[in-house]
Swiss-Prot record:
Gene3D superfamilies: Ribonuclease H-like superfamily/Ribonuclease H. GO terms for biological process: DNA metabolic process. It comes from Neisseria meningitidis serogroup A / serotype 4A (strain DSM 15465 / Z2491). 3'-to-5' exoribonuclease specific for small oligoribonucleotides. The active site is at residue 128. GO terms for cellular component: cytoplasm. Residues 7-170 form the Exonuclease domain. It comes from the Bacteria. This is Oligoribonuclease. Keywords: Cytoplasm, Exonuclease, Hydrolase, Nuclease. SMART domains: EXOIII. It is found in: Cytoplasm. One of its GO terms (molecular function) is nucleic acid binding. The gene is orn. InterPro entries: Exonuclease_RNaseT/DNA_pol3, Oligoribonuclease, RNaseH-like_sf, RNaseH_sf.
Length: 187
């Protein structure tokens, strides 16, 4: 059910970091309530890309996506970016009104750059703000290093795993880093 206070978490895996030359190869989405309780998760979509594009990935992406099996899943997938964009829009619209949720995740600006180019309707459904866990990570490193060091990262580089890890990391910062005050009912 739609709720303007729900949060939409997203992660993408790409063939590289440049949206002008690289492409999205995996994406997943999770909806939480404002207290970070998971309400729903989308399917994990591997998006078909050409062999030429996959064969030209840099060393890190070739090794990482090869190790996780993503490269093979992408080769075998029949999903297009447009098809996945529509499926994610349909999923998201069940839970969050248009432009109500910030885009949530880790280093989410990078995902947004790719979304602007390859999934613009989905990007436009989000609020223009980002809820980026990496901002809290950078602040904790500088202002409270023990809190930053106590975060355990698995770094699987699988979209769904990375989202769950981002939500867990946000819970950690909420509990150990952010000042806790009595919560007023959201208006």
């Amino acid at each position: 059910m739609q709720d303007k206070n729900n949060l939409c978490w997203l992660d993408m895996e790409m063939t590289g970091l440049n949206p002008e030359t690289d492409r999205i190869i995996e994406v997943a989405m999770i909806i939480t309530d404002s207290d970070l309780n998971v309400l729903a998760q989308s399917e994990v979509y591997a998006i078909h890309q050409s062999d030429e594009l996959l064969d030209n990935m840099d060393e890190w992406n070739t090794a990482t996506h090869g190790r996780t099996g993503l490269t093979q899943r992408v080769r075998e997938s029949s999903h297009t970016e447009a098809e996945v964009e529509q499926k994610l829009l349909d999923f998201m619209s069940e839970w969050v009104p248009r432009r109500a949720t910030p885009m949530c995740g880790n280093s989410i600006h990078q995902d947004r750059r790719f979304m602007v180019k390859y999934m613009p309707k989905l990007e436009n459904y989000f609020h223009y703000r980002n809820l980026d866990v990496s901002t809290l990570k950078e602040l904790a490193k500088r202002w409270n290093p023990p809190v930053a060091k106590s975060v355990v990262k698995r770094g699987s580089h699988k979209a769904l795993d990375d989202i769950l890890e981002s939500i867990e990391e946000m819970r950690h910062y909420r509990e150990h880093f952010l000042i806790s005050a009595p919560r007023a009912e959201a208006q």
